[in-house]
Structure formats: structure tokens, C-alpha cells
């Protein structure tokens, strides 16, 4: 991810003649402690690119992904809250679709799950009626989640 970002957005990381660098890459360890938070990175596949999600205590945020390996899934047990990619209804090569998203939620089995990163065809109210579990909800702008 770092290599890809630096290649695509070189000007943000390296001083240019008329443009100073504005970002510095901070590489996270697999496990970190920030104050009273245990932060763990979760490796996921986003098409051919590897990206990461985050587990923070009993909360996880996994936005852009197509596949989570079994070893990484094990790290996501006993979650209170999961925010997970749910791009669209039809299959996509770099994101999980609705059915795949629900399968991952079933495997991870969090107390509550929120769907994010939704394509414009994912109407909030229609999506809510398609979800048969009251502990799974689509995200919306301005949503506040108590963790």
C-alpha cells in the first residue's frame, strides 16, 4: 500500500521544486498500543492489492476488500462492532457484494455490523428491508456508533 501510494502521489511525500511534501508515511506494526486502545491491522485483499483493516479492542473497520484469509478472520472473533465493505448487489472484482458481505458477517459473528462503502444503487431503505437481521444495518452520513 505504501509503495502504491508513493508511486501514485509522489508529490505528497517527496519535496518538489515548487511544492513541499505534505505527508510522511507512518507504518503501523501488526499490533500497537495507543493509550488504552489495542490496535491490530487486519490484512485483506482488494483485488490484486493487499490493503488493511483495523481492529481496535472489540471494534473492527474493514472497508475496501474482496477477501479475508482464514488466519485474519480468526483475529476478528468476539467483536462488539464490525464496520464492513458492502459495495453493491452484483459481483465486483475488488469489493465484496451484498451476499459476500453477509457471509463474512456470518463467519465473524459480531454483536452488531454496519455496512459501508456502498455504491449508489444501494438505497438505504431498500437495503434495510433486504437485511433480515436487526443487528446488521447500513451506514449513513452522520451515523454515530456507540462503541
Feature map (PLM): residue ranges:
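Binuclear metal-dependent hydrolase catalytic cores
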Residues: 1-62, 66, 128-147
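Binuclear metal-ion centers of metallo-dependent hydrolases, dominated by the metallo-beta-lactamase
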Residues: 69-81, 86-147
